[in-house]
A protein has these predicted regions:
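Low-complexity, highly charged intrinsically disordered N-terminal segments
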Residues: 36-97
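Outer-membrane beta-barrel transmembrane strands
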Residues: 116-118
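Buried, small/hydrophobic-residue-enriched core segments of structured protein domains
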Residues: 4-47, 105-112, 121-124, 130-212
Length: 212
């Protein structure tokens, strides 16, 4: 889709918590790390009797992540650095963080990150990681938690919807057995009618996929 947004090449770099723009220098206050690990761990449940969360949404997120950063890697190196510094100046003031690490990432040509997790659809106990991710090049230690913001924003909805749907399916299946009802009717009883109540089409798609 055509866009007139001249900041489009760095849009993905702005999809983070603002303090993480300075993570590279914050980490260095304690030395220079090589590998930074992060994890996705559901810390608790708000549903009585539910102590597992269905892992779902990571594969879709990784595809999106690649799409988001494609304009960055396709753009001119000097342009992305100029745009990044211009945007930083608008947010934090001039000459704050710099763009050398952004230039290095552009020259790398891809996101040096690795993800490892359980199979999608697996119920994972609360307080146990569903997946972990880390930087595969020591120079980009800052990148792991830089993208953690989008990880959180993209994963919680589909995994939560999948968890709720799993619990509802259990209740409906048990009810069908207890009342002697046709088990095939459960597929209709548990259909997803949430689209109209979602915040966006994208949210509805993520939630609907989790429900299925």
């Amino acid at each position: 889709m055509h866009t007139t947004d001249r900041f489009a090449p760095i849009r993905a770099l702005m999809m983070t918590d603002v303090y993480k723009l300075g993570h590279i220098e914050q980490y260095r206050l304690a030395g220079t790390p090589e590998i930074v690990y992060s994890n996705w761990t559901n810390r608790g449940s708000r549903i009585d009797g539910v102590d597992h969360v269905v892992h779902f949404g990571l594969q879709a997120f990784l595809i999106k992540l690649g799409d988001w950063f494609a304009p960055f890697f396709a753009a001119d190196e000097d342009l992305v650095c100029e745009l990044y510094e211009e945007r930083l100046a608008q947010i934090l003031g001039p000459n704050t963080i710099g763009s050398d690490h952004i230039r290095a990432l552009h020259r790398k040509g891809y996101l040096p990150l690795s993800f490892s997790g359980v199979e999608e659809g697996t119920p994972v106990p609360v307080r146990v990681p569903s997946f972990v991710f880390w930087n595969t090049d020591a120079e980009f230690f800052w990148l792991t938690n830089y993208i953690e913001t989008t990880v959180s924003a993209e994963i919680w909805q589909p995994s939560t919807s999948a968890t709720i749907a799993r619990e509802l399916r259990r209740v409906l299946d048990e009810g069908a057995v207890r009342t002697g009802s046709d088990p095939a009717a459960v597929d209709w009883q548990g259909h997803d009618f949430s689209f109209r109540g979602m915040s966006s089409v994208e949210t509805a798609a993520a939630s609907g996929a989790g429900h299925l």
